[in-house]
Amino acid sequence: MSWRPQYRCSKFRNVYGKVASRENCYDCIPITKNVHDNHFCAVNPKFLAIVTESAGGGSFFVIPLHQTGRIEPNYPKVCGHQGTVLDIKWNPFIENIIASCSEDTSVRIWEIPDGGLKRNMTEAVLELYGHSRRVGLIEWHPTAINILFSAGYDYKILIWNLDVGEAVKMIDCHTDVILCMSFNTDGSLMATTCKDKKLRVLEPRSGRVLQETTCKNHKVTRVVFFGDMKRLLTTGVSKWNTRQIALWDQEDLSMPVTEEEIDGLSGLLFPFYDVDTHMLYLAGKGDGNIRYYEITAEKPYLTYLMEFRSPAPQKGLGVMPKHGLDVSACEIFRFYKLVTLKNQIEPISMIVPRRSENYQEDIYPMTSGTEPALSPDEWLRGVNKGPVLMSLKEGYRKENKAIYKAPVKEKKSLVVNGIDLLENVPPRTENELLRMFFKQQEEIRRLKEQLSQRDLLVRQLELELKNLRNSPKDS
């Protein structure tokens, strides 16, 4: 019988993080001070987008990826929102299209010129209104082009078909603020976490809840699908107030498959999963560490590999898509770290050390490409398809020919699931909401006072009528 080691040998056990040199970082960026638990950063092979601090509305920078170094204070911004920008996401199939959502209750679609911005951009190619409160999350469908999901503080998820510029579905099964949305590989399933302490697995087209559990010993904040492994991972806090991760079977959420405590820090844990290498990265908000694990279908499921440490705390992290990585350097993942203490964006490359300079096929399998598998109409009809795969062997040289043509919209009511979402224009910020509330309170008080006066007048008239009826008898 041959001898076998008790530990599992992994080709990723020596992966290390390499921080970009100072001249390859992005300096002097006024990163937003908003405390919303998002990354405030989005990146693709062309552009880097960062939500910035601004007065009188929300804005974000869009910087060509090669334009590193110091960013001028008067650098052009995307600044059309009337409230703080809370989330931004690049279209995975059209690299010049970015979506943003804001406290002004809107979702907006922007088209960035190839060379970047030369002046402030204030006009979006499409403005989407449907939420009655601020919109905190947006996600693109992973395989269908121009399908966008938005989650608002009205506890609703709207599904937008950007080809027609309208919400086509509404998911209203949540009873509190939605914290996170994640899709499986083909986008046929969606997992959500919510402030009501529930983890849900949904069929996104119908909004039907397939699995649901209340996490009693594990307060969930973030969730991520493990590709086609039929597993979910959540990050959160244990009943002892320690940061914790839990692995779930997507078809049975009655109890977690396994749980693991991470540390006693208080910052949110952001999970990132690489479906090609089956590696999980855990990055803590407010600290500078990134832990990474290898995921397997059998026990122990999670194998700890190593930890990247940095003294500079991170506010959020953007992630470069696989086709934007440097395969010649054996780079398998790249973060863009928001360092508010330095007003800096710091690229961090995760590298597999190899002596050979040849293409390493074992760490670069076929990966999700930039071609959509489905049109919006096909997906809405119920078709499911996995992503269109591409090879990274020749590097990413493809010129994306896909373009987005915004629909011409007429003013009309927006009816989703039998509910008119635009029957009344919603307040766009929290201050407007408070003003509207106090105005309504004053109007209610005034109406009650008028009603009381009219009740008194009615009683007086009834008494006079009674006296008139009795007067002939007295005569």
Curated annotation (Swiss-Prot):
The role this protein plays is:
May play a role in the reorganization of neuronal actin structure.
Q: Where in the cell is it found?
A: Cytoplasm, Cytoskeleton
Alphabetic keyword roster? Actin-binding, Coiled coil, Cytoplasm, Cytoskeleton, Repeat, WD repeat
SUPFAM superfamilies the UniProt entry points to: WD40 repeat-like
Please report a single Pfam family linked to this protein. WD40_4
Q: Which family does it belong to?
A: Belongs to the WD repeat coronin family.
Q: Which positions does the entry assign to WD repeats? A: 80-120, 130-172, 174-212, 215-258, 260-303
Could you tell me which species this protein originates from? Xenopus laevis (African clawed frog)
Would you tell me the protein name for this molecule?
Coronin-2B
Q: Which residues form a coiled coil?
A: 431-470
One GO MF term on file is: actin filament binding
UniProt GO cellular component terms: cytoplasm; cytoskeleton
